Amino acid sequence: MDAWLTWLKSIGGRSEKTIISYRNDLQKFLSFMSNHFQDNVSPETLKNVALIDMRAWMAFERSNGLSARSLARKLSSVKGFFTWFAEKEKFEATEILAVRSPKFYNKLPRPLEKAAAVDLISTVKLQNELNWVSARDCSILTLLYCCGLRISEALNLKQSDAPLPEILRVLGKNNK
């Protein structure tokens, strides 16, 4: 494991925190495999890890409350290790590398509570001594919060768009 981490550091492109995460992921994986095989994990043991063993590890992680997203990240670490290990030890790791990551869905952003939005707008009013700047900033925040505009949509409003009608028709990305 240390040789793999040293190799990762040598090729660069990864932060120290990423390397630490990889180390933790692999240590937990190897600990599971040691318990799973009821033996110390050796290079020969790793060469014999099969799809069923990988699925057992993934099921164990999920049963301990690990989210699908976190499991996918850990699986990526383990696959990275096995890619390096298979090349170093000259064996075929296709079965392990073919394990699919669990599906996960991006969470929708949570809306700001009304009280928090009012506080934000009140704070913005106090941040600038120029009335027109405060009015502009409050207007933009109101459009973002109350009308659901994206920042780019609010910033693309032109003077010719004023005064805004009572009903606002927003054409966002791809004129949707």
Regions found by a protein language model. Name each.
Residues M1-K176:
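Conserved catalytic core of the tyrosine transesterase superfamily
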